[in-house]
């Protein structure tokens, strides 16, 4: 079973996020943390789903350079509302502005993940739609003053107070909003350690060929 391979593999989480650390621990994966300071800039022509993929690859490759024989897991999360991309707020005012825009609206949370292991590399992303109720200025100010969400894309954590009282519904993976789509990550790790699994999946999704020997008579 591929889980046994994971227990015998040096796994590095290339992220300092406490949420990603918690999620990997809860998934039963043994790992250590190593981060590198990288410029989180991206080309302006990238599509929104490509942005976190691009940044996760930069993070993964930076750590892989120091630990070429380890399995590296890197991730990046952005919040998107129409044409606006929300990263981590740099100030309380910026956080307030983000939450005012998210209030009574739907936005998408997109997490890109890159896994590197030797010559193998896999990248994927997941999208979750989040619907906020109307957020009063009192709620916004209270949350920012007490929870200081300056390390979170979109200026909120779904697992925190504002997520509990302010989110009306979500469509997609809850853990993706926390910063790591664990179910997809496990699937991709299993494919990495068991290539036949991916081949079987491709074959099972392939449409059936038409019957070459089916004839219609008149």
From Swiss-Prot:
Reactions performed catalytically: dTTP + H2O = dTMP + diphosphate + H(+); UTP + H2O = UMP + diphosphate + H(+)
Among InterPro entries, the record links this protein to:
ITPase-like_fam (IPR029001), Maf-like (IPR003697)
Keywords assigned by UniProt, alphabetized:
Cytoplasm, Hydrolase, Nucleotide metabolism
Q: Where is this site: Important for substrate specificity?
A: 19, 77, 159
Its Enzyme Commission number(s) read 3.6.1.9
> A Gene Ontology CC term for this entry?
cytoplasm
What are the GO BP annotations of this UniProt entry? nucleotide metabolic process
Catalytic residues, per the record, are: 76
What is its cofactor? a divalent metal cation
Subcellular localization is given as:
Cytoplasm
Main subcellular localisation:
cytoplasm
* Pfam families xrefs: Maf
**Membrane spanning residue stretches:** none
GO MF annotation list:
dTTP diphosphatase activity; UTP diphosphatase activity
**The keyword Cytoplasm belongs to this UniProt entry's keyword annotation:** yes
SUPFAM superfamilies registered for this protein in UniProt: ITPase-like (SSF52972)
Instruction: State the function annotated in the UniProt record.
Output: Nucleoside triphosphate pyrophosphatase that hydrolyzes dTTP and UTP. May have a dual role in cell division arrest and in preventing the incorporation of modified nucleotides into cellular nucleic acids.
Q: Which family does it belong to?
A: Belongs to the Maf family. YhdE subfamily.
Q: Please identify the protein, giving its name as recorded.
A: dTTP/UTP pyrophosphatase
High-level lineage: Bacteria, Pseudomonadati, Bacteroidota, Cytophagia, Cytophagales
